[in-house]
């Protein structure tokens, strides 16, 4: 009776559980547009990563399967499909086995075959030693702050061999799979890894969306050669609008040297590039390219003024980051109003007085100047 009840429960879970594909759109953020990603459900299925990281599902023809390394459909005998791995239910009967796809998923085995698949509750992982779900988090370098994102156990199972790709945690990091082994590196200086071009470049303000703007601790810091006395600075961080740097003496060194000290504005404030310190984020004139979506939290879409001299441009934000590469723009004769969350008709001069992104200024390095208003 107990066994029948267990099998009935598993059957119900199987009916209620859709086959768990990994979050393909999320991993498309790490690769170039046009990259082909394998399915974790069928060897014949794969996805094309398109603009804005939207995957398009495709299926190989008869008697062929997708091979991630050749980026195409090949005869079954020539493929490197991870679903051809040893059966996790081999030699198992009436028990559970961990999934090879994600740490919070499991299989139920009967007579050495998989008869059901399932997922643990949010906040839990499957513990093979206990044959049950326990509270915990996946131990993965590719974990993300979004609670609905479960990383694949081995990212090299889905990434093309020998090709560079980005990192979810740090915008300066790059990764590459060499015969199934993950290799990591970091871009030099203040460069970040641009997944669109597959190389290290100066950040244009859109390259770090996949990491919520997170870079290494000094990723947006000014060059150390600019810190030679306590009179230097403060200078803004190039990537995080709320961060700035103060040049202070390094008391641990002989002879006397100076180093930048990373400092953060209070919550809700940005650092002003004209040296006026921290103030309400809307009023500050920030370094062009820093993340103005910072402080927009939650899954609700929100729009903020992008730096522009005519106040027409706006960025689309969610969870503290831009979700589109290109900024939107109001029609001629309109300006974007953050408080109203839409484009208003008329002159923006009064609005610009208390909204720094609309004030006409430009920066050459850290030398910023104002210009006559564009009305």
UniProtKB/Swiss-Prot annotation:
Signal peptide range in chain numbering: 1-20
UniProt xrefs under SUPFAM superfamilies: Invertebrate chitin-binding proteins
Entry function: May bind chitin or related oligosaccharide structures.
Source organism of this protein record: Lucilia cuprina (Green bottle fly)
Protein name, UniProt field: Peritrophin-48
Glycosylation-annotated residues: 117, 360
Chitin-binding type-2 domain ranges (all copies): 25-83, 86-143, 153-210, 224-292, 294-360
Modification(s) after translation: Glycosylated.
Claim: Signal is one of the keywords in the record: yes
Gene Ontology CC annotations of this record: extracellular region
Keywords: Chitin-binding, Disulfide bond, Glycoprotein, Repeat, Signal
């Amino acid at each position: 009776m107990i066994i029948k009840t267990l099998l009935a429960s598993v059957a119900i879970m199987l009916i209620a559980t859709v086959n768990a594909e990994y979050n393909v759109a999320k991993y498309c953020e790490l690769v170039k547009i046009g990259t082909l990603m394998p399915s974790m459900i069928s060897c014949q299925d794969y996805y094309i990563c398109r603009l804005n990281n939207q995957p398009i599902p495709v299926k190989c023809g008869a008697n062929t399967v997708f091979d991630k390394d050749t980026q195409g459909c090949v005869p079954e005998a020539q493929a490197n499909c991870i679903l051809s791995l040893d059966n996790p239910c081999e030699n198992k009967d009436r028990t559970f086995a961990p999934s090879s796809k994600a740490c919070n998923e499991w299989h139920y085995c009967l007579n050495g075959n998989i008869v059901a698949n399932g997922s643990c509750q949010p906040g839990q992982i499957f513990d093979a030693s206990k044959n049950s779900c326990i509270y915990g988090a996946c131990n993965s370098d590719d974990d993300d702050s979004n609670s609905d994102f479960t990383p694949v156990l081995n990212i090299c199972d889905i990434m093309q061999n020998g090709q560079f790709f980005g990192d979810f945690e740090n915008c300066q990091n790059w990764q590459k799979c060499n015969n199934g082994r993950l290799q990591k590196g970091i871009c030099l200086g203040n460069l970040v890894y641009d997944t669109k071009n597959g190389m290290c470049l100066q950040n244009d303000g859109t390259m770090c969306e996949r990491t919520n703007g997170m870079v290494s601790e000094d990723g947006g810091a000014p060059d150390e050669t600019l810190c030679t006395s306590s009179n230097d600075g403060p200078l803004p961080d190039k990537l995080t609008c709320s961060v700035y740097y103060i040049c202070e003496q390094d008391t641990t060194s002989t002879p006397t040297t100076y180093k930048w000290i990373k400092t953060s504005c209070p919550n809700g404030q940005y650092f002003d590039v004209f040296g006026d310190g921290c103030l309400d984020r809307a009023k500050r004139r920030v370094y062009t390219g820093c993340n103005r979506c910072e402080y927009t939290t939650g899954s609700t879409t929100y729009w903020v003024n992008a730096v522009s001299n005519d106040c027409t441009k706006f960025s689309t934000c969610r969870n503290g980051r831009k979700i589109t590469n290109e900024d939107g723009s109001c029609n001629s004769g309109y300006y974007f109003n953050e408080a109203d969350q839409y484009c208003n008709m008329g002159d923006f001069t009064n609005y610009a007085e208390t909204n720094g992104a609309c004030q006409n200024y430009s920066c050459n390095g850290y030398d910023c100047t104002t210009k006559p208003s564009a009305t």
